[in-house]
Amino acid sequence: MRPTGRSAQQVRPLKLTRHYTKHAEGSVLVEFGDTKVLCNATVEEGVPRFLKGQGQGWVTAEYGMLPRATHSRNAREAAKGKQGGRTLEIQRLIARSLRAAIDLKVLGEYTITLDCDVLQADGGTRTASITGACVALADALNQMVANGKLKKNPMKGMVAAVSVGIVNGEALCDLEYVEDSAAETDMNVVMTEDGRMIEVQGTAEGEPFSHEELLSLLALARGGIETIVQAQKAALID
């Protein structure tokens, strides 16, 4: 029995609140159970130096956790003077995932930055960030079209992510913290809305996993992501 009584295939209650802050071109509060992440999209003219003159845009991301997002206070990374390796890895993952959602040539020479700030962490913060940031990105692009900055929307489709893992020998979808901390295998999967894979991060924390278990986890992730994409699309209609 899982802590909240979910089935092995079931994702946590998912809520996507759009227009959460008023200044950002796209702003979404994403909630997976007790994990809550604020995702803001900012549109700026111009691109990084390595892309200048190529007629294409760029999507990047930053990720951080509030000091009391977890059970005990963690000092702000700004106070330490540098970002940690985990933070850098996660924000690069978010950016790579979202670049797969749009046609950068159609975007033109604009940069969109997704700021993902974890308000409360209970497992799956990176996957929640990708899911919420994709909706914020969609809102920002829709606004650019409405404002005449873009003639065509460069969005190719939704991108979503979920964690899966093996806990006490059972494959589970969308791990909360107590499950994640006890997992023998932990995996983060990012997919397009039509089920193509963008990224798979899998680690055997205890026992190595078999090829069959890998396929089982990927199938579990795909089912969870299908549910998440439906929620993303429903949120964008509201």
From Swiss-Prot:
Cited function? Phosphorolytic 3'-5' exoribonuclease that plays an important role in tRNA 3'-end maturation. Removes nucleotide residues following the 3'-CCA terminus of tRNAs; can also add nucleotides to the ends of RNA molecules by using nucleoside diphosphates as substrates, but this may not be physiologically important. Probably plays a role in initiation of 16S rRNA degradation (leading to ribosome degradation) during starvation.
Quote the EC number.
2.7.7.56
Q: Where does this protein hold phosphate? A: R86, G124, T125, R126
State the oligomer form and interacting partners. Homohexameric ring arranged as a trimer of dimers.
Q: Which gene encodes it?
A: rph
Record's superkingdom?
Bacteria
In Swiss-Prot or TrEMBL terms, this protein is called Ribonuclease PH
The record's listing under InterPro entries reads: ExoRNase_PH_dom1, ExoRNase_PH_dom2, ExoRNase_PH_dom2_sf, PNPase/RNase_PH_dom_sf, Ribosomal_Su5_D2-typ_SF, RNase_PH, RNase_PH_bac-type, RNase_PH_CS
Q: Name one Pfam family in it.
A: RNase_PH
User: Has UniProt tagged this entry with the keyword Nucleotidyltransferase?
Assistant: yes
Q: Catalytic activity annotated for this protein? A: tRNA(n+1) + phosphate = tRNA(n) + a ribonucleoside 5'-diphosphate
Do you know which NCBIfam families this protein is assigned to? RNasePH
Give GO terms for biological process: rRNA catabolic process; rRNA processing; tRNA processing
Keywords from UniProt, A to Z, are: Nucleotidyltransferase, RNA-binding, rRNA processing, Transferase, tRNA processing, tRNA-binding
